[in-house]
């Protein structure tokens, strides 16, 4: 008996999607992306177009309103008296609002200008004068890097700064001196910032002292004075020292000034 053997048919290997399906999916993806981009562009265009239409509509309404006012003034019979009176009252209200806004702006500007006039900047900075070696009250000059903001502060007789407006002032002074005295005279060098109120006696506001130096030929030392004080119109301030012959008058050594706060 002859037995026959049939080999099993091998299963076909799994294949991917057909090429037509890949092309379809690719086209569908491109279509969706294009549609999204187109929708976004259309939305932007529509938004801008609506804004433009809104502006044109507002402009048209303004034109119609002005045209109606013109027709009311010419007395055309196509408009009733009631409509004309109402339109005129609206127009007058608009004009009044505009004029009020202009007046308020003018008042604000005027107030700012008056405020600037009422509170001008007052400042002074003067430099020491070498001729003050013979008097205890230091003398000053408007030279070098000096400041004299306006006529509300003046340098009187080269010795004192006089203010013409009441207020708080920051007053300062720097005195540089050369102390090379003999050992027999060891009194400290004293600088005083003094005030002379109008019709009153002068008084000392600030005072500072520094000991002498034995350095040869000269040991430079500086004294700084500064403070905030209330000054009346016509008040004067000046600087007094115990030994003016020791004061250094070089550039930037000795100065004096004030500033209205």
Curated annotation (Swiss-Prot):
Gene3D superfamilies hit by this protein: 2.60.120.40
PROSITE patterns hit by this protein: THD_1, THD_2
Known role: Cytokine that acts as a ligand to CD40/TNFRSF5. Costimulates T-cell proliferation and cytokine production. Its cross-linking on T-cells generates a costimulatory signal which enhances the production of IL4 and IL10 in conjunction with the TCR/CD3 ligation and CD28 costimulation. Induces the activation of NF-kappa-B. Induces the activation of kinases MAPK8 and PAK2 in T-cells. Mediates B-cell proliferation in the absence of co-stimulus as well as IgE production in the presence of IL4. Involved in immunoglobulin class switching.
The gene coding this protein: CD40LG
Top-level lineage group: Eukaryota
GO cellular component, as recorded: cell surface; extracellular space; plasma membrane
Glycosylation site list: 240
Domain THD: 122-261
Pfam families given in the database record: TNF
Modified how: The soluble form derives from the membrane form by proteolytic processing.
Keywords: Cell membrane, Cytokine, Disulfide bond, Glycoprotein, Membrane, Secreted, Signal-anchor, Transmembrane, Transmembrane helix
Cytoplasmic membrane side: 1-22
Name the record gives this protein: CD40 ligand
Localization in the cell: Cell membrane; Cell surface
Transmembrane intervals: 23-43
Family assignment from sequence similarity: Belongs to the tumor necrosis factor family.
Subunit structure: Homotrimer. Interacts with CD28. CD40 ligand, soluble form: Exists as either a monomer or a homotrimer. Forms a ternary complex between CD40 and integrins for CD40-CD40LG signaling.
Molecular function GO labels: CD40 receptor binding; cytokine activity; protein serine/threonine kinase activator activity; tumor necrosis factor receptor binding
Regions of this protein lying in the Extracellular compartment: 44-261
Record carries keyword DNA damage: no
InterPro entries in alphabetical order: CD40L (IPR003263), TNF_CS (IPR021184), TNF_dom (IPR006052), Tumour_necrosis_fac-like_dom (IPR008983)
Species this chain originates from: Callithrix jacchus (White-tufted-ear marmoset)
Annotated site residue numbers, Cleavage: 112-113
